[in-house]
Swiss-Prot record:
SUPFAM superfamilies: Restriction endonuclease-like (SSF52980). It comes from Methylobacillus flagellatus (strain ATCC 51484 / DSM 6875 / VKM B-1610 / KT). GO terms for molecular function: nucleic acid binding. It comes from the Bacteria. Pfam families: UPF0102 (PF02021). Belongs to the UPF0102 family. This is UPF0102 protein Mfla_2283. PANTHER family: UPF0102 PROTEIN YRAN.
Length: 113
């Protein structure tokens, strides 16, 4: 399962680099949680949650970013910004489906703090 997650994050990273984003950190961890990718697009810090689902049961990948997960991401992002300097930021999601190898959905501003 961990390998599948690592592969999904690597695929998402390559996709976002092709879209012009720059990697700042991978798997940023603190006591509040973890952010899969921290990237930069222009002057904006982009916190990216990568989700892979094998099927659409229970809403697919997007539905798996529930309120508790969003709160952990927000706290972790605040921790990152306190240590690395404040900047405009947003939360994006990359949604991948095991059933559709070519299917990458990039949701910019997936949620707000």
């Amino acid at each position: 399962m961990k390998q599948l997650g690592d592969d999904a994050e690597a695929l998402a990273e390559r996709y976002l680099i092709k879209q012009g984003l720059v990697v700042i950190a991978r798997n940023y961890r603190c006591r509040f949680g973890e952010i899969d990718l921290v990237m930069k697009q222009g002057a904006t810090i982009v916190f990216v949650e990568v989700r892979m689902r094998s099927h659409a049961t229970f809403g697919g990948a997007a539905a798996s970013i529930h309120a508790a997960k969003r709160q952990k991401l927000i706290l972790t992002a605040e921790h990152f910004l306190q240590r690395h300097g404040s900047a405009p930021c947003r939360f994006d999601a990359i949604l991948l489906s095991k059933r559709d190898a070519d299917g990458i959905e990039w949701i910019q501003d997936a949620f707000s703090a």
